[in-house]
């Protein structure tokens, strides 16, 4: 059985779509998914990147594209009342659902639906309280243990080369993005391409120029 780690932040519409698409994509395969929440902003800061919603033309395109993708894949999705928003409270809830900070699929789904269903305010305090009551948390979401677990999850992801969400890891290989799901499935089905040198050969390509 393959163990797949799904790195996600609920702020990402692509992570939500990948989450919803994953069971169908992996149908017929023998696997276990570990859902690991990370702070997307922490990944961006570490790698010196801007998020797609921080570049105005890209922000508009992102929202158009994810709505089209949801429509095309038959996934229920509405943009939240505002985006980007601060996902920390939600991430701490999902971490607090399990003593090790690793939620099951049910909890992860509830958090994603909180954000991406209904077009509501993801940070609304009353909605957050309702969600907290529903999840029956194992840890105090506002306590130091949860805060440290989220930091540790993010640092662990960075140490493995994760730079964005969603990222799926299996056998030490990283598959980034919703559009990488077919590539992941091909790997799990032992596609012959992965037995070649192409995966590692890209690391040998020299940088021709760099921005100053």
Where are these predicted regions, by residue range?
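A short, charged/proline- and glycine-enriched loop
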Residues: 1-2
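Structural alpha/beta surface segment adjacent to cysteine/selenocysteine redox centers
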Residues: 10, 16-115, 198-212
């Amino acid at each position: 059985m393959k163990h797949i780690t799904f790195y996600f932040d609920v702020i990402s519409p692509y992570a939500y779509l990948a989450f919803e698409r994953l069971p169908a994509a992996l149908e017929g395969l023998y696997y276990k998914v570990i859902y690991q929440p990370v702070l997307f902003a922490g990944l961006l800061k570490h790698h010196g990147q801007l998020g797609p919603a921080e570049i105005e033309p890209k922000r508009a395109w992102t929202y158009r594209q994810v709505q089209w993708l949801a429509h095309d894949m038959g996934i229920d999705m509405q943009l939240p009342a505002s985006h980007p928003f601060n996902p920390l409270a939600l991430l701490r809830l999902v971490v607090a659902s399990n003593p090790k900070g690793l939620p099951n699929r049910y909890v992860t789904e509830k958090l994603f639906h909180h954000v991406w269903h209904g077009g509501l305010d993801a940070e609304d305090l009353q909605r957050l309280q309702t969600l907290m009551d529903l999840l029956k948390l194992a840890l105090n979401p506002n306590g130091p243990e949860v805060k440290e677990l989220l930091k540790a999850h993010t640092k662990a992801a960075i140490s493995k080369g994760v730079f964005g969400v969603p990222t799926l890891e299996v056998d030490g290989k990283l598959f980034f993005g919703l559009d990488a799901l077919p590539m992941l499935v091909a790997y799990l089905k032992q596609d012959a391409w992965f037995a070649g040198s192409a995966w590692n050969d890209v690391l040998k390509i020299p940088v021709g120029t760099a921005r100053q």
